[in-house]
Amino acid sequence: MAVDSTDQRRDFVVRIDGEDNGDSEKFWRESSINFWHNDKSSKPPGGEEDDGSFDFMRRSSEKSEEPDPPSKLINQFLNKQKASGDEISLDMEANMPELQKNTVPPLSSTAVSGSASPVTAPVTASYRNGTGDAIRRRQNRVTLSPSVKDGDSSEDEENRVDGSEVVKCTSNRSTMRTKTLMKMKTRSRLMDPPTPTYPDMVSGRTPRSGNLNPGFSGRNTKPGTPNQGGSKDLEEEEDPFSEEDLPEGLRKEKICVWVIIEWIFLILIIASLICSLVIPYLRGKTLWDLALWKWEVMVLVLICGRLVSSWIVKLFVYFVESNFLWRKKVLYFVYGIRKPVQNCLWLGLVLIAWHFLFDKKVEREMRSTVLKYVTKVLICLLVAVIIWLIKTLLVKVLASSFHMSTYFDRIQESLFTQYVIETLSGPPRIEIHIEEEKVANDVKTFEIVGRKLSPLGPKAVSSPPQVTVGSGRLQKSPSRVGKSPVLSRSGSKKEGGEEGIRIDHLQRMNTKNVSAWKMKKLMNVIKKGTLSTLDEQIQDTTTQEDDKATQIRSEFEAKLAARKIFQNVAEPGSRYIYMEDFMRFLSEDESERAMDLFEGASECHKISKSCLKNWVVNAFRERRALALTLNDTKTAVNRLHRIVDVLVSIVILIIWLLILGIATTKFLLVISSQLLLVVFVFGNSCKTIFEAVIFVFVMHPFDVGDRCEIDGVQMIVEEMNILTTVFLRFDNQKIVYPNSLLGTKPIANYYRSPDMQDAIEFFVHIATPPEKTTALRQRILSYVDNKKDHWHPSPMIVFRDMCGLNSVKIAMWPTHKMNHQNMGERYVRRGQLLEEIGRLCRELDIEYRLYPLNINVKSLPAATPITSDRIPPSWNQQRSV
């Protein structure tokens, strides 16, 4: 029920949670109908309260006032509702003039969040925030206070707002929290967060202190050190990959408690073995008709066999590391399977010792079958470890080859893009080099004149900075001028000491010479790092560098970063960035390669603001999609590993049964019958899993973020799993496809397609002069040739068809300088071309309209009066007259 009066309008000010909760006696807890009665008492009768009701505060003043006309109407309506026994409801609309006064203060953010803290907020602002539909509520109690008379003074106005018509509502915190969680749950990973109110990249700044999450931290905590990959000049390095193929954590030997215990037992058992062989009394001692020293050797192998096998593994690893080719290709897998190999050697030593110490003679003397079963158990354990070793090696080899063949090119391009963004957002290197030479010349001048200067620290003569991709800052290290920048992933303090990847090494890598360690490090840079920019000034301290580094985590921040880069690189007042501007930040080869990244820059040799903005935004999208792809692939590999573990465990169990002799004919008959039942129940599921694995790892037709077309519907890949793939349709509806079903469907991938064509068709009249059509064709070709950043030159334009004898269809097939992954950009360029074609047709006076048709009348009826029942009689009379 909306309150409105043509004679007089009253202001209804509603305050939510705005009153002190200490005065509980001021709240009305009884039926809301009785509130409208002229009750003189300030305390409400009764004290029971209902959790599902609205609690409205009464007027603080006990002085009764004459209700105004709107209040009388409300009173009459509520009394009628009470008499009829119907449910009472109050409708307050957003267009009520009582709720649209300018005197109402704005709504605070705390009130909208649904918290129960005392916050003053009007209902008017809640309408603006989209909560107007929550105003209409049907409850058992609704209590309103009469309106307040108009006041002239400011004090009266303040008192009127604070003490008169105030509504205290209990906020539903759990409902709003549930809505927020549902919104976060259904949000796509490929969609940006809401654009911040203030255009500042605050979300990308990392605080000075606190624990850093490796997935979100923006910097490497330790600067470059002389023993990193970029510490020496390229000419001085005989093996550029010698220090990078082996992680620092594997070089350090970890000493655990078990190793210490093994060393202690090794010393004690060797001492007891020497005593049993030297002392005559112990030399003749036997246990179960077996010499004492044999038992000691058996215990030594059981307890200290892992220690001895670890020595053998370390010796093998040392020989692998000494060979360059083996180190690049084999070392990663050697470190991955060194534990299973160590267990194999240990069990092999135990089996050899058991076989040669407890020979057939001892077995005949003891007349027991226990030794035979112990031997079989040892053989079973050794076979199980060997099979597990083969399984681990195969999974690692297949996963490494899959990542290397599928994602290496994208990772290399993404890291170079990140390097370009960070370098262009920092200070010019040529200026740093000139400043360093100036400082060095000044130092030499002072030394010549005889002044003794204190040794310069790293801050006095700084070396050219090292760019750490993902770290978000330029790192300074005490190396010489001309050193190649270093790329490393962002990580926590625990992972911050990991060495980086030099940019020149990155450019020389390919799928043939990259090692598995290097590929794993590149993947970590993508998965745990983010695009970042640098402010123009580089500070000396690490904390100041941390505050200056800014990460790009949304397309909005990417646009801000592009604007900062343009202001940093372009000359003051210039509208474009030229090759000379790039040369101030990058080398000549890097500048040429960077120019090729921009659309149309290789032809016109300049970059506009819009082109730079689109490039940074596309780089952010590509980086986000690649990181999500690698994460999903890692999850899929882990799940595949678990599936293979189950299958291998079943195979090992069957082999154990065969070795132990348990698998008799009757046993196999029972197992086969049960196996048939299992195949009947789970056969289809196993087939589906196998087809899904083949689809994900062998076919692999798309990655996360790719635009695909399946059954005529264009969709974006949202998430990839072992069994299913989640797509986003054009209206952001999530569609889940089983991978086994996708394997049987043709899939069109726009992202992996080359530059794609477009088709434009339009009609002209057949009577259009040929001169106009020729001029139209030439002007269209001229327009396309001038748009070098959008279209390939010389598109095909032909007269394709003729519709009767009235019009001619002209078809045009221009080729974009991109594929249709970004469908919005495709239609923008197509729309601009259509607008140009329409403008050219108007200029050339080319129109399509039907000419008048000639109608030939062969005969007319005789000139006799026409009599018809459908014509009024008065018309016939007028004709006869």
UniProtKB/Swiss-Prot annotation:
| Signal peptide (UniProt feature, chain positions) | none
Q: Does the keyword Membrane apply?
A: yes
**Positions with biased composition (Acidic residues):** 234-245
Region of interest (Disordered), residue spans: 35-245, 457-501
The Gene Ontology biological process terms listed for this entry are:
monoatomic ion transmembrane transport
Provide one Gene Ontology cellular component: plasma membrane
Keyword annotations for this protein, in alphabetical order, are: Ion channel, Ion transport, Membrane, Transmembrane, Transmembrane helix, Transport
Keyword Nucleotidyltransferase assigned: no
Residue ranges with Basic and acidic residues bias: 56-66, 492-501
Where along the chain is composition biased (Polar residues)? Answer: 73-82, 100-118, 206-230, 463-478
Per the record, membrane topology reads: Multi-pass membrane protein
Compartments, as annotated in UniProt: Membrane
Give me the segments passing through the membrane. Answer: 255-275, 297-317, 339-359, 377-397, 643-663, 678-698
Q: State its role.
A: Mechanosensitive channel that opens in response to stretch forces in the membrane lipid bilayer.
Q: Which family does it belong to?
A: Belongs to the MscS (TC 1.A.23) family.
The identity of this protein, by name, is: Mechanosensitive ion channel protein 4
Organism per entry: Arabidopsis thaliana
